[in-house]
Swiss-Prot record:
Keyword Cell division: yes
Protein name: Cyclin-D3-2
Family under the similarity heading: Belongs to the cyclin family. Cyclin D subfamily.
Organism, scientific name: Oryza sativa subsp. japonica
Gene: CYCD3-2
Keyword Transmembrane helix attributed: no
UniProt GO MF annotations: cyclin-dependent protein serine/threonine kinase regulator activity
Disulfide bonds: none
Compositionally biased spans, kind Low complexity: 340-349
InterPro entries found in the cross-reference section: Cyclin, Cyclin-like_dom, Cyclin-like_sf, Cyclin_N
Amino acid sequence: MAFATLFDSLYCPEEHLDLFHDTAADDDLHLDLHLHQPPPPPPLLDDDLPALFHALRGKEDPLRPAADDDGYGGVSAREAAVGWALRAVARLGFSALTAALAVAYLDRCFLGGALRLGDRPWMARLAAVACVALAAKVEETRVPVLLDLQLCAAERADPNEAYVFEDKTVRRMELLVLSALGWRMHPVTPLSYLQPLLGTAHAARLHHCDTALLALMPDWRWPRHRPSAWAAAALLATAGWCGGGGGDDAELLALIDAPKDEMAECAKIISEEAAAAAAGGIVIGGENKRKGAAGLYSAPASPSGVIGASACFSCDSSSSSVDSLFAALEPPGRPIKRGAAAATTADPLPADEESRDAWPPYAA
């Protein structure tokens, strides 16, 4: 008898198939079970926030490389890479935290010196694909395949969007990104402060803060300031939109405890962007805010690991080699267009083109 009780939890109650079954007893049973369910975990108490934010501030490391030490190779290159990542996150319906993580991964790789574009400007796009994929694996519950991720973010009107990277190529870049990050996948972002601070009780204001911050991520000044400064500046910027202000905002800013001068600089940047967006009839964080960002950065010749978007659906494309991704570039030319890829069959790469000499060094 005692042995049978060990397996009672493994059996599910069967539904009654007779038409004359009385469901009142079942309703009472379900109500009783509902009343005896364990309560949900309590929200983060205010007493825990100072210790949490103190730990977050200790992990902050703003990236301030010199002008000649920018791994992106220019402001427009970063704007294009970050703009593509944000567009992919928005079209796939990912959260704002996923976008913040992807941008943090990108900046850590390029501004930290682990990756450099050099004569391979297509590497920024490849890194953006890998960073979005990694951020989605960390934060999202449903992650699309790499092909769908790239095609969903492609702009059909842009000729430079008419190619995608093979899965093996993206996975190799993911390993490079993980190595550059030291396998630390949860860097501090402004949302690390805003989400526990506002939570579900102030969901509308949190949404406004997310929107304002997402619109500023492609800006070259974004990685130059601490996440706590951006979080505090977002609270200041959204005080008028959501009816905040007064003593409540003062307490919130005191909890974040960002440097005053840096917070004022970030607030100034947000106000400038808001004024520029209002003058152009664009809402901050809207779809058209950075619509032309990707067009500022035109990629030259395609690497060997890039294939036409139409050729992705061909059986022949799966047999092409991708181990020569960072080998010598092909002669200058245009990437394979969507229309031309269907009518053109690319010659398979020779087997001896598997060289890793041109791979960027791993971060120490």
